[in-house]
Amino acid sequence: MSQTAIIIWIVVIIILLVLGGLGAYFFYSRYRHRKNIPPTPINPPSSITPIQPINPPSSITPIQPSGPPSGGNHPIPASCPAYQLVNNKAITLVPLPADTSNVKNAQDCQNLCTQNPDCYFYNYVGLFDGCSLMQGTVDNNVMTGFAIRGSEDGCPKWARYNTSIQGFNTGNPSNVESEEKCQQLCQQNSSCDWYTYDIGKKTCTLNKAIDFNTSTLGIKMPH
C-alpha cells in the first residue's frame, strides 16, 4: 500500500472517531438533560367536594289521630247534665273503696262519685240504700263508651273512658276496624247500653246492663 493511501485511511479513521465522539457526546447530553428534569406531578384538584349526606328532617311530624268518634269527650256546656241517669239498671263490678255509711239517697251516692276522680259511674239501690262507686279495669288499649240517651243538642252523646267493663254481652261483631264503627253498631242496637273496643285487637263488644228494680245507674260525664 502506498504512503498516500495509508495517510488517507488514517484521516478517514480520525474523522470517524471524531464523528463517533460527537455522536456519543450528543446522546449523553440529551440523556443527562432528561434525567435532571423532574417529572411533572399530577396534582389533585385544589379541593374535593365531599358527598353531602342527606340529613333527615330536624323533627318528624307524627301522624295525628283523626280524633275521637262523634260524641267524644269534649268540654261539656254548663247547661248539660253532669251525669246520665238510667233507672232500673245496674252494672255488677267490684266497687271502689269508699265510705258509703252516710248515703241516704241517690244524690248522696252521686256526690261521692263526683268527689272521687276514679269513679266513672255508680249504682244506687233504693231498696236498701246501697251505693257502689265503680271504675272498671283501666286499660289504655281499651275504650268503653256509654250511650247517652236523649241528650240535648250540644251535649255529649257518649261518655268514653279507657276502661273495660263486663256486662251482658249482646253482640261481638267481627272485623270492626275502628272505635267509631263499634260505636255506630252500639247505636243501632237498642239493647246496647255501652260498647267496649279493644284498639290493639280491633275487637268490639256490645254490652247491656242488668235489669234491677229500684236501682239507678249514674254515668259520670267526662270533662
UniProtKB/Swiss-Prot annotation:
Residues 39-73 are annotated as: Disordered. Glycans are attached at N162, N189, N213. One of its GO terms (cellular component) is extracellular region. The keyword Signal applies. Residues 80-155, 159-223 form the PAN domain. PROSITE patterns: PAN. Pfam families: PAN_1. Residues 45-64 have a biased composition (Low complexity). Keywords: Disulfide bond, Glycoprotein, Repeat, Secreted, Signal, Virion. It is found in: Secreted; Virion. Disulfide bonds join C80-C155, C109-C131, C182-C204. Residues 1-23 form the signal peptide. Its main location: secreted. This is Putative PAN domain-containing protein R486. It comes from Acanthamoeba polyphaga mimivirus.
